[in-house]
UniProtKB/Swiss-Prot annotation:
Active site positions: K165, H284
Protein name as it appears in the record: Ribulose bisphosphate carboxylase large chain
InterPro entries referenced in this protein's UniProt entry, alphabetically: RuBisCO, RuBisCo_large_chain_AS, RuBisCO_lsu_C, RuBisCO_lsu_C_sf, RuBisCO_lsu_fd_N, RuBisCO_lsu_N_sf, RuBisCO_lsuI
Record note on modification: The disulfide bond which can form in the large chain dimeric partners within the hexadecamer appears to be associated with oxidative stress and protein turnover.
Any further remark recorded for this protein: The basic functional RuBisCO is composed of a large chain homodimer in a 'head-to-tail' conformation. In form I RuBisCO this homodimer is arranged in a barrel-like tetramer with the small subunits forming a tetrameric 'cap' on each end of the 'barrel'.
Keywords annotated in UniProt: Calvin cycle, Carbon dioxide fixation, Chloroplast, Disulfide bond, Lyase, Magnesium, Metal-binding, Methylation, Monooxygenase, Oxidoreductase, Photorespiration, Photosynthesis, Plastid
Organism this protein belongs to: Ruttya fruticosa
Length: 466
């Protein structure tokens, strides 16, 4: 066959509407905004080409392989309702394009290069379908939801956490004292903030030691298992693992990682260490909004959430629906199901473009955190259910009587909501009444209710369904 040099349109090779997807294909749904004058078929084909085998011109080495076997294919295009220039382009990638067990390689291929492409005004990856054949090459979360409950001996209610504030500036001893007060008052976990690593005012080893002391002292007082998310995120993978090793030697139950700033390679390494050494792994999503906030460009958080479940983490921050951070209810619950459940049906009303079968990969507990307080407890309990961590930073430490009473208020509120739900009451309709009733016999809760009775974060969500 003679080699024919020159430039030809992508759609001649990469737009294949007749293609029937295979069970082993990775499927992607891209929101494509082509430049004026670029037809959607060409734009969709360009995305498929540039994120798989294509380049801008025909090359003679194409003849040395089977492009039909390895190329990505744009197999369907739908206009986005209400937008004149946006399309959802569906692309199928053969599994052989990806290294086994590597989220890093998956993202480098699918979103690594194509987002700077000149023929596109904007591009957003809305969803991925990960086939079971690829999922089986990943370890996934170190332990999963059921194992975590068994380790902690806590059942039938959401878990409670608190991020220690001020996030930066406390000495290690004062930091440990704040943890102790919260844990003693009734919380299950306290937490390092995402940017607490090892700074001049508090080196990591000192913090780990004082927090371990807080854990053991509060456990002895309450008879409950306690934890503090010790942030092992560091400048190098070796240093990160060193911190995780020290946490294990202290006998604490859980460590933490910032998975986007730390990177997927580091995160997967830490997840493997945590499974091998019995540590739970809490994941913070710092930097996610840089990637997922714009509606027409970037990557939706549901993709980052799926990637985290593959890479490994037992908890991940997922927004609150009711607090100070972005998150619309249906969309949030869509990716919360993708984190927790074994099988999730396609449901476009919740932003789920593909049916996803996780083939027994352990689940991840969603963490609701950011601007929430006791008045939100009924809504949070109803929205997230038992398999969640509800995290109140300011909502614990901002209590007028201090940390421990703040923790008591949150624990009383969550127990009251769970009891009311189990008795068949409607948390959405009767939530305020349930909290008021509980506050009659808990002065700590009554004081918290008084402080935050008028606090609301009323802004419309940016991330809405079309």
């Amino acid at each position: 066959v003679g080699f024919k040099a020159g430039v030809k349109e992508y759609k001649l090779t990469y737009y294949t509407p007749e293609y029937e997807t295979k069970d082993t294909d990775i499927l992607a749904a891209f929101r494509v905004t082509p430049q004026p004058g670029v037809p959607p078929e060409e734009a969709g084909a360009a995305v498929a080409a540039e994120s798989s085998t294509g380049t801008w011109t025909t090359v003679w080495t194409d003849g040395l392989t089977s492009l039909d076997r390895y190329k990505g294919r744009c197999y369907n295009i739908e206009p986005v309702l209400g937008e004149t220039d946006q399309y959802i382009c569906y692309v199928a990638y053969p599994l052989d394009l990806f290294e086994e067990g590597s989220v890093t390689n998956m993202f480098t291929s699918i979103v690594g290069n194509v987002f700077g492409f000149k023929a596109l005004r904007a591009l957003r990856l809305e969803d991925l379908r990960i086939p079971p054949a690829y999922i089986k090459t990943f370890q996934g979360p170190p332990h999963g939801i059921q194992s975590e409950r068994d380790k902690l001996n806590k059942y039938g209610r959401p878990l409670l956490g608190c991020t220690i504030k001020p996030k930066l500036g406390l000495s290690a001893k004062n930091y440990g004292r704040a943890c102790y007060e919260c844990l003693r008052g009734g919380l299950d976990f306290t937490k390092d903030d995402e940017n607490v690593n090892s700074q001049p005012f508090m080196r990591w080893r000192d913090r780990f030691l004082f927090c371990a002391e807080a854990i053991y002292k509060s456990q002895a007082e309450t008879g409950e298992i306690k934890g503090h998310y010790l942030n092992a995120t560091a400048g190098t993978c070796e240093e990160m693992i060193k911190r995780a090793v020290f946490a294990r030697e202290l006998g604490v139950p859980i460590v933490m990682h910032d998975y986007l700033t730390g990177g997927f390679t580091a995160n997967t390494s830490l997840a493997h260490y945590c499974r091998d050494n019995g540590l739970l792994l809490h994941i913070h999503r710092a930097m996610h909004a840089v990637i997922d906030r714009q509606k027409n460009h970037g990557m939706h958080f549901r993709v980052l959430a799926k990637a985290l479940r593959l890479s490994g983490g037992d908890h991940i921050h997922s927004g609150t629906v009711v607090g100070k951070l972005e998150g619309e209810r249906d969309i949030t619950l869509g990716f919360v199901d993708l984190l927790r459940d074994d099988f999730v049906e396609q449901d476009r009303s919740r932003g789920i473009y593909f049916t996803q079968d996780w083939v027994s990969l352990p689940g991840v507990i969603p963490v609701a955190s950011g601007g929430i307080h006791v008045w939100h407890m009924p809504a949070l309990t109803e929205i997230f259910g038992d398999d969640s961590v509800l995290q109140f930073g300011g909502g614990t430490l901002g209590h007028p009587w201090g940390n421990a009473p703040g923790a008591v208020a949150n624990r009383v509120a969550v127990e009251a909501c769970v009891q009311a739900r189990n008795e068949g009451r409607d948390l959405a309709a009767e939530g305020n009444e349930i909290i008021r009733e509980a506050s009659k016999w808990s002065p700590e809760l009554a004081a918290a209710c008084e402080v935050w009775k008028a606090i609301k974060f009323e802004f419309r969500a940016v991330d809405t369904l079309d």
